[in-house]
Protein backbone atom coordinates (compact mmCIF):
# COMPACT_ATOMS: atom_id res chain seq x y z
CA UNK A 1 0.00 0.00 0.00
CA UNK A 2 1.32 3.44 -0.95
CA UNK A 3 1.64 6.13 1.61
CA UNK A 4 -0.02 9.47 0.95
CA UNK A 5 2.66 11.18 2.99
CA UNK A 6 5.57 10.73 0.61
CA UNK A 7 7.75 13.81 0.52
CA UNK A 8 8.84 15.10 -2.85
CA UNK A 9 11.69 17.44 -3.46
CA UNK A 10 10.39 20.85 -4.51
CA UNK A 11 10.41 21.42 -8.23
CA UNK A 12 12.80 24.23 -9.08
CA UNK A 13 11.25 27.30 -10.64
CA UNK A 14 13.08 27.79 -13.92
CA UNK A 15 10.65 29.91 -15.95
CA UNK A 16 13.00 32.87 -16.34
CA UNK A 17 15.89 30.57 -17.14
CA UNK A 18 13.87 28.70 -19.76
CA UNK A 19 12.80 32.02 -21.29
CA UNK A 20 16.41 33.21 -21.54
CA UNK A 21 17.54 29.92 -23.07
CA UNK A 22 14.68 30.00 -25.57
CA UNK A 23 15.32 33.65 -26.51
CA UNK A 24 19.01 32.93 -27.08
CA UNK A 25 18.26 29.92 -29.25
CA UNK A 26 15.66 31.92 -31.20
CA UNK A 27 18.15 34.76 -31.70
CA UNK A 28 20.81 32.37 -32.95
CA UNK A 29 18.37 30.67 -35.30
CA UNK A 30 17.08 33.95 -36.68
CA UNK A 31 20.62 35.14 -37.27
CA UNK A 32 21.72 31.87 -38.82
CA UNK A 33 18.75 31.85 -41.19
CA UNK A 34 20.10 35.01 -42.79
CA UNK A 35 23.42 33.33 -43.55
CA UNK A 36 22.00 29.95 -44.50
CA UNK A 37 18.90 30.98 -46.46
CA UNK A 38 18.42 34.67 -47.17
CA UNK A 39 21.85 35.72 -48.40
CA UNK A 40 22.32 32.68 -50.67
CA UNK A 41 18.96 33.48 -52.31
CA UNK A 42 19.94 37.13 -52.74
CA UNK A 43 23.35 36.17 -54.16
CA UNK A 44 21.89 33.65 -56.62
CA UNK A 45 19.07 35.86 -57.90
CA UNK A 46 20.96 39.10 -58.50
CA UNK A 47 23.16 39.93 -61.44
CA UNK A 48 23.45 43.65 -60.64
CA UNK A 49 25.74 44.89 -57.90
CA UNK A 50 23.58 47.90 -57.04
CA UNK A 51 20.47 45.76 -56.47
CA UNK A 52 22.47 43.27 -54.42
CA UNK A 53 23.81 46.11 -52.25
CA UNK A 54 20.34 47.58 -51.82
CA UNK A 55 18.98 44.23 -50.62
CA UNK A 56 21.92 43.68 -48.27
CA UNK A 57 21.52 47.20 -46.83
CA UNK A 58 17.80 46.61 -46.17
CA UNK A 59 18.51 43.23 -44.61
CA UNK A 60 21.16 44.86 -42.42
CA UNK A 61 18.79 47.68 -41.48
CA UNK A 62 16.01 45.39 -40.27
CA UNK A 63 18.44 42.97 -38.65
CA UNK A 64 20.08 45.88 -36.84
CA UNK A 65 16.72 46.86 -35.39
CA UNK A 66 15.72 43.38 -34.19
CA UNK A 67 18.82 41.32 -33.40
CA UNK A 68 20.69 43.63 -30.97
CA UNK A 69 17.43 44.20 -29.07
CA UNK A 70 16.95 40.46 -28.66
CA UNK A 71 20.59 40.07 -27.59
CA UNK A 72 20.22 42.81 -24.98
CA UNK A 73 16.94 41.36 -23.71
CA UNK A 74 18.42 37.86 -23.48
CA UNK A 75 21.59 39.09 -21.79
CA UNK A 76 19.59 41.23 -19.36
CA UNK A 77 17.50 38.23 -18.39
CA UNK A 78 20.61 36.09 -17.84
CA UNK A 79 22.16 38.93 -15.79
CA UNK A 80 19.03 39.23 -13.64
CA UNK A 81 19.00 35.48 -13.04
CA UNK A 82 22.72 35.41 -12.18
CA UNK A 83 22.39 38.41 -9.85
CA UNK A 84 19.32 36.96 -8.12
CA UNK A 85 21.00 33.61 -7.57
CA UNK A 86 24.26 35.16 -6.37
CA UNK A 87 22.39 37.43 -3.95
CA UNK A 88 20.96 34.40 -2.14
CA UNK A 89 24.22 32.44 -2.23
CA UNK A 90 23.19 30.02 -4.98
CA UNK A 91 26.38 28.36 -6.17
CA UNK A 92 25.33 27.94 -9.82
CA UNK A 93 24.82 31.63 -10.59
CA UNK A 94 27.95 31.70 -12.77
CA UNK A 95 26.37 29.48 -15.44
CA UNK A 96 23.87 32.25 -16.18
CA UNK A 97 26.51 34.98 -16.03
CA UNK A 98 28.60 33.04 -18.57
CA UNK A 99 25.52 32.51 -20.76
CA UNK A 100 24.81 36.25 -20.75
CA UNK A 101 28.40 37.20 -21.52
CA UNK A 102 28.55 34.69 -24.35
CA UNK A 103 25.30 36.02 -25.82
CA UNK A 104 26.30 39.68 -25.71
CA UNK A 105 29.68 38.83 -27.26
CA UNK A 106 28.00 39.50 -30.62
CA UNK A 107 28.45 43.23 -29.92
CA UNK A 108 32.25 43.39 -29.56
CA UNK A 109 32.59 40.82 -32.36
CA UNK A 110 30.55 43.08 -34.63
CA UNK A 111 32.43 46.23 -33.65
CA UNK A 112 35.91 44.76 -33.95
CA UNK A 113 35.71 42.07 -36.61
CA UNK A 114 32.75 42.91 -38.84
CA UNK A 115 32.59 46.70 -38.82
CA UNK A 116 35.19 47.30 -41.58
CA UNK A 117 33.26 45.04 -43.97
CA UNK A 118 29.93 46.55 -42.89
CA UNK A 119 31.29 50.05 -43.48
CA UNK A 120 32.60 49.13 -46.92
CA UNK A 121 29.28 47.58 -47.95
CA UNK A 122 27.36 50.62 -46.68
CA UNK A 123 29.72 52.95 -48.53
CA UNK A 124 29.31 50.98 -51.75
CA UNK A 125 25.52 50.97 -51.34
CA UNK A 126 25.56 54.77 -51.53
CA UNK A 127 27.30 54.73 -54.91
CA UNK A 128 26.47 53.25 -58.31
CA UNK A 129 28.35 51.28 -60.94
CA UNK A 130 29.96 48.87 -58.47
CA UNK A 131 31.63 45.64 -59.58
CA UNK A 132 29.40 42.61 -59.07
CA UNK A 133 32.41 40.40 -58.28
CA UNK A 134 33.65 42.77 -55.57
CA UNK A 135 30.20 43.16 -54.02
CA UNK A 136 29.55 39.41 -54.06
CA UNK A 137 32.95 38.78 -52.49
CA UNK A 138 32.27 41.26 -49.69
CA UNK A 139 28.84 39.80 -49.01
CA UNK A 140 30.24 36.26 -48.91
CA UNK A 141 32.87 37.50 -46.43
CA UNK A 142 30.09 39.12 -44.40
CA UNK A 143 28.10 35.85 -44.43
CA UNK A 144 31.00 33.89 -42.96
CA UNK A 145 31.55 36.46 -40.21
CA UNK A 146 27.81 36.61 -39.53
CA UNK A 147 27.69 32.82 -39.28
CA UNK A 148 30.40 32.91 -36.61
CA UNK A 149 28.57 35.72 -34.81
CA UNK A 150 25.34 33.68 -34.91
CA UNK A 151 26.93 30.93 -32.84
CA UNK A 152 27.51 33.13 -29.76
CA UNK A 153 23.85 33.19 -28.65
CA UNK A 154 23.60 29.44 -29.25
CA UNK A 155 26.60 28.83 -27.00
CA UNK A 156 24.90 31.11 -24.47
CA UNK A 157 21.76 28.97 -24.71
CA UNK A 158 23.78 25.81 -24.17
CA UNK A 159 25.43 27.29 -21.08
CA UNK A 160 22.07 28.51 -19.80
CA UNK A 161 20.48 25.12 -20.44
CA UNK A 162 23.27 23.43 -18.48
CA UNK A 163 22.44 25.78 -15.61
CA UNK A 164 18.78 24.75 -15.81
CA UNK A 165 19.75 21.07 -15.84
CA UNK A 166 21.93 21.60 -12.76
CA UNK A 167 19.07 23.30 -10.94
CA UNK A 168 16.78 20.40 -11.81
CA UNK A 169 19.37 17.89 -10.58
CA UNK A 170 19.82 16.32 -14.01
CA UNK A 171 23.37 17.54 -14.65
CA UNK A 172 26.03 17.54 -11.95
CA UNK A 173 29.30 18.83 -13.43
UniProtKB/Swiss-Prot annotation:
Membrane topology value: Multi-pass membrane protein
Keywords, alphabetical: Glycoprotein, Membrane, Monooxygenase, Oxidoreductase, Transmembrane, Transmembrane helix
Keyword Transcription carried by entry: no
Molecular function terms from GO: monooxygenase activity
EC number, UniProt record: 1.10.3.-
Gene Ontology CC entries for this record: membrane
Pathway: Secondary metabolite biosynthesis
Domain of life of the organism encoding this protein: Eukaryota
Compartments, as annotated in UniProt: Membrane
Inducing or repressing factors: Expression is positively regulated by the cluster-specific transcription factor MYCFIDRAFT_198930 and is up-regulated during banana leaves infection.
Transmembrane region(s): 23-43, 62-82, 93-113, 138-158
Cross-referenced Pfam families: Anthrone_oxy (PF08592)
Sites carrying sugar chains: 118
Catalytic activity: emodin anthrone + O2 = emodin + H2O + H(+)
Predominant location: membrane
Biological function: Anthrone oxygenase; part of the gene cluster that mediates the biosynthesis of an emodin derivative that may be involved in black Sigatoka disease of banana. The pathway begins with the synthesis of atrochrysone thioester by the polyketide synthase PKS8-1. The atrochrysone carboxyl ACP thioesterase MYCFIDRAFT_190111 then breaks the thioester bond and releases the atrochrysone carboxylic acid from PKS8-1.
Protein family membership: Belongs to the anthrone oxygenase family.
Cross-referenced PANTHER family: ANTHRONE OXYGENASE ENCC (PTHR35042), ANTHRONE OXYGENASE-RELATED (PTHR35042:SF3)
Record-given protein name: Anthrone oxygenase MYCFIDRAFT_34418
Amino acid sequence: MKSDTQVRAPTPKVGKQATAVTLGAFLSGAMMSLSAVMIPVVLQTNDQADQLLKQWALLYHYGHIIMPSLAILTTSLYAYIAYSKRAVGHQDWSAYAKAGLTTIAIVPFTLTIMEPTNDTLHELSRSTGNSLDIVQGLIVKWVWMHTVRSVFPMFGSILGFRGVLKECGVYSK
